[in-house]
């Protein structure tokens, strides 16, 4: 079972590291091409392109300039510990054991606008470049065209290495659009998390993102190998709803949170 998740805009390069083990990202040549494009952008360009404040634009122009082809523990940290958005609040990677990290290294991948596909312990320099960014490049007008089949091919390598043909899609639509499911050597299973609000069950972004992280952790901690076992996910009050699910979409619900 291979899990894919989205990255996060919020980053943490300050907290103590939960592991000293690390690996090198495998698509740095592609990242370098994108950095070369990004280095030509002014702060005003970045603010407009990414729809961010001048302060965040300045920060990321600086990051593009400082980015190095050499990844060290001085300028980088492991991706799974650097990302700190809602998904990663649910994942709580900082409390995983060494054995969990080892398992995650084989069974978890993070999609990324700049790095393409990251293993949990891959070193990552700080950046902001969301997959949906309309960044013109030599391969097209956006990052989906830039990455083409590269991410899908890398996922197929990971699928082959980990032993079965099930991919659990815990990524957002923006990021999973960078994957070509028809070219994947796997069945794609997409969990859907619905929370009760005012008597109605619906996908609430904040809760759904956190639930994706919690499910990733559940798979890692429990070494889940089958979809049947995945339906037993019950973290934080979620429960599987068979009658609303299909073979490819697993619906989980939760009662209203106070």
From Swiss-Prot:
Annotated coiled-coil segments of the chain: none
Domain of life: Bacteria
Gene Ontology process terms (BP): response to hydroperoxide
Record-level GO cellular component terms: cytosol
Pfam families per record: H2O2_YaaD (PF03883)
InterPro entries reported in the protein's UniProt record: YaaA
Family: Belongs to the UPF0246 family.
Matches recorded under PANTHER family: PEROXIDE STRESS RESISTANCE PROTEIN YAAA, PEROXIDE STRESS RESPONSE PROTEIN YAAA
NCBIfam families registered for this protein in UniProt: PRK02101.1-1, PRK02101.1-3
Protein name per Swiss-Prot or TrEMBL: UPF0246 protein VP0504
Organism: Vibrio parahaemolyticus serotype O3:K6 (strain RIMD 2210633)
């Amino acid at each position: 079972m291979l899990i894919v998740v989205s990255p996060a805009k919020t980053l943490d390069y300050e907290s103590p590291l939960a592991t000293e083990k690390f690996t090198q990202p495998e698509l740095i040549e592609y990242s370098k091409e994108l950095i070369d494009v990004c280095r030509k952008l002014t702060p005003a360009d970045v603010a407009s392109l990414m729809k961010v404040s001048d302060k965040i634009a300045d920060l990321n122009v600086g990051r593009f300039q400082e980015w190095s082809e050499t990844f060290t523990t001085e300028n980088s940290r492991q991706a799974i510990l650097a990302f700190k958005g809602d998904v990663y609040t649910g994942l709580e990677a900082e409390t995983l054991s060494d054995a969990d990290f080892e398992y995650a290294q084989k069974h978890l991948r993070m999609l990324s606008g700049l790095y393409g596909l990251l293993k949990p312990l891959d070193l990552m320099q700080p950046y902001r470049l969301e997959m949906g960014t309309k960044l013109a490049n030599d391969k097209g007008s956006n990052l989906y065209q830039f990455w083409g089949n590269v991410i899908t091919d890398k996922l197929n390598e990971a699928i082959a290495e980990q032993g079965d043909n099930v991919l659990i899609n815990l990524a957002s639509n923006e990021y999973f659009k960078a994957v070509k499911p028809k070219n994947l050597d796997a069945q794609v299973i997409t969990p859907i998390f619905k929370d009760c609000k005012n008597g109605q069950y619906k996908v609430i972004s904040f809760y759904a993102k956190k639930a994706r992280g919690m499910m990733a952790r559940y798979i890692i901690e429990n070494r889940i190998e089958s979809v049947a076992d995945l339906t037993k996910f019950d973290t934080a009050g979620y429960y599987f709803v068979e009658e609303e699910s299909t073979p490819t979409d697993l619906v989980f619900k939760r009662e209203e949170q106070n």
